[in-house]
Amino acid sequence: MTDRVKTALLAMQRHNWEQGVAAQAFLEAGDSEIAIALALEGANRQAADGRCCHIADSTACTDPCAVGEALIFAAEQTGDPFLRAARDKLLHWAMHDAPRSPSGVVYHFQQGRLIWVDSMYMLPPFLARAGEYDEALRQLDGYWATLYTPENGLLAHQWSDETRRFVRRDAWAVGNGWAMAGMVRVIALLPEAHPGRNRLIQRVQQLIRASLPHQQPDGAFRDVLDDPTSFREVNFAQMLAYTIYRGIAGGWLDRSLLPHAEKARAAALAEVDRYGLVRNVCGAPYFDRPGVAPEGQAFHILMEAARIK
């Protein structure tokens, strides 16, 4: 089944973040040659300012960094000067040129001064893999401080620094999944003695606690976690399962969470069709209805890789 999901992912059109999460999925699944090929294509499409996977007139700031860990891996494995230069240019963008809030948080786009929860996956793992541990933590701390909503214990989707209010306060399921998965990766990359590591672990645990009461009897979740009228979707189920599997393997989540992960995984497996498409995820291109999406394919692969390990 996973091979069909991989083939379907490779056949899909992909934006910058989708190219990045696809590369990460193949990297974590041990498909190194495909991960390198995807990273190379991201480097081939590098903009003059350093952003990778550039398509059309995208103004995204953090999404082009989603390919970052795979790009570093590709540069290390091949020794290719082109890939090393692309890695360095992307890191320079992320560290120095990307537009930031007054507190130093990288905005999601070059205009609008918007902070999105998605960025917690797109940028900090790349920074951590590049050895910029403190900057990775600074970004995660800033996103958390801006987007955490204590009334439900979850993260809102979008904040505007221009209007000083939420653009979308909803606890978007996939957005909280991006946040959990991004923090999981940074936790694994940080030195165990790093003072910020336990802070991230506690935050992942908090999001899991706040999410689980919203799990449906079949293991799936709603598109907005605490809104039972929003549509059913299974990509967050995959993201949650991935998070739990990796947390248990890392020794910082309790094995009592495993049944929740297995239930979530079962809901997602039931949606894989004969073409290898994971149906009823929050669907591309508008993400306002159930459908299919490259990120839904990628997190199926990531979930299965984490479960095996």
Regions found by a protein language model. Give the residues of each.
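Charged/polar interaction segments and conserved charged motifs
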Residues: 1, 24, 30-32, 38-39, ...
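CBM-like carbohydrate-recognition segments
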Residues: 1-20, 27-68, 72-89, 97-101, ...
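Extended ligand-binding clefts on enzyme/binding-domain cores
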Residues: 114-120, 124-223, 230-241, 256-281, ...
